[in-house]
Amino acid sequence: MKSKVIKIQGITGEMPLVAVSGLPGLGAVGINAASLFVSEGSSVLISQILIKSSSSNLIVSENGVVSPSAFNVYYVTSKDFLKPILVLLGSFQSQNAVEQYKLAETFLHLAKKLRIRYVFSLGGFQTLRELKTRNVFIVPNDLMTLRLSVVQGLKLASGQITGAAGLIAGLSKYYGFKGGVLLAETNGQIPDNVASQLLHDKLLSLINKVSAS
């Protein structure tokens, strides 16, 4: 099965400038941070992405209806940010590297069609230190994002970033997007709501900065 995009609804309002992705990972930090944008704003499900392993990760509704796990793409507006954003959420990460690439490419193709300019992926940053205070790290794809991130107090990170967060951010540069990957410090507690809230807040500030630039 190839990756497949199911269009649910078209966008009738202002086109989004920024796309955000959050999938399950360390401390569930990324998905919960991205979910805050959807739950706290006015969100509309516009598309669903299916990959091969969607059929083996099933969801059963309260009425007993079984359906494959899809990756949902939301169009979100809010008084908290200047322009609408696109948010990708999913209930799992494929353990197959090829499928992870397919998901990333499909999402980025969709973002390209919608003329998105910035793509930010979210995740957790494993730390063993006592977390009296938390840092949020960024690996930016462009100079503008780097400059704005430093102003927002984000720390620069280096090294290997695994999973969907690293893959989507890494590929997005080759699709011509600005942005990068943001990672909040966590000790791996599930869920780490403190890390997710901090990550959400830092990205919100950054989104408003890039929207105004």
Q: Could you describe each region identified by the protein language model?
A:
Residues 29, 99-103, 164:
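Short, glycine/acidic-rich beta->alpha junctions
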Residues 86-88, 118-120, 178-183:
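Hydrophobic/aromatic beta-strand patches that form the interior of the parallel beta-sheet core
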Residues 95-143:
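Internal, conserved structured core segments that host functional sites
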Residues 1-91:
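N-terminal short beta-loop-beta anion/metal-coordinating cradle
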Residues 127-206:
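Catalytic cores of processing enzymes, dominated by hydrolases/peptidases
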Residues 23-29, 94-95, 124-129, 188-190:
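Gly/Ser/Thr-rich loops at beta-strand to alpha-helix junctions
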Residues 34-39, 104-106, 197-200:
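Short, solvent-exposed amphipathic alpha-helical segments in soluble enzyme
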